């Protein structure tokens, strides 16, 4: 019996020792993944100002309004497509590369659920998925939300003032930027007030910058949680 007790004690001691050693090894692995992935997420963050400048330039803002009006009237998703083309190479691709370092499967329901745990606002991202990719979905969904928050009153007034015919003319293209601006501004004070223009040129850049940087951080956080689950 004493011999059995000694053997059991030694066994438990070995198990305990292994368990204690596993914690720093796991943390070291995470640190290594972080070091390899961080440059990609940093690249995405550095590209945010240029993307925001592109999306909030007056011509782009008018075109986005036209696309949002058409989507509202026709049930299309052209705003998402437009934003995807603007966000993909400078922001989405680096984030996808960073996620790949962690070995994340961003098409899985598990990763979508983790994103929702990181930020409850991501719970509805499946409806915005392009090709089923969650990383694309969170950027598109959040950017659309920011645009709707800032430009929603413009879109509502354009929808009521012009109707589907002008919405299609604005969105179909190809139209020169000057023509797009002329169509949108044609509604005068009814469709685009001075306050609306101020929001588009002043409020939207700051809001969009903060949002995109937040999504980049949340994306990396979700990747780390995926590894640790």
What are these language model-derived features?
Residues 1-125:
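Terminal export/targeting leaders at protein ends
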């Amino acid at each position: 019996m004493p011999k059995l007790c000694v053997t059991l004690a030694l066994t438990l001691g070995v198990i305990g020792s292994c368990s204690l050693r596993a914690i720093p090894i796991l943390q070291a692995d995470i640190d290594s993944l972080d070091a390899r992935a961080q440059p990609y997420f940093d690249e995405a963050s550095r590209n945010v100002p240029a993307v925001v400048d592109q999306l909030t330039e007056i011509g782009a803002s008018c075109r986005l309004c036209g696309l949002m009006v058409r989507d509202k009237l026709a049930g299309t998703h052209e705003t998402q497509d437009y934003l995807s083309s603007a966000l993909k190479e400078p922001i989405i691709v680096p984030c996808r590369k960073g996620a790949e370092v962690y070995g994340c499967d961003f098409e899985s329901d598990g990763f979508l659920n983790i994103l929702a745990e990181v930020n409850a606002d991501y719970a509805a991202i499946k409806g915005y998925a392009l090709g089923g990719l969650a990383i694309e979905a969170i950027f598109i969904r959040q950017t659309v939300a920011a645009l709707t928050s800032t430009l929603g009153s413009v879109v509502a007034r354009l929808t009521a003032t012009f109707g589907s015919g002008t919405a299609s003319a604005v969105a179909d293209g190809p139209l020169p930027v000057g023509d797009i601006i002329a169509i949108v501004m044609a509604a005068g004070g009814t469709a685009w007030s001075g306050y609306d223009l101020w929001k588009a040129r002043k409020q939207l850049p700051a809001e969009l910058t903060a949002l995109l940087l937040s999504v980049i951080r949340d994306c990396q956080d979700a990747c780390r949680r995926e590894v640790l689950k």
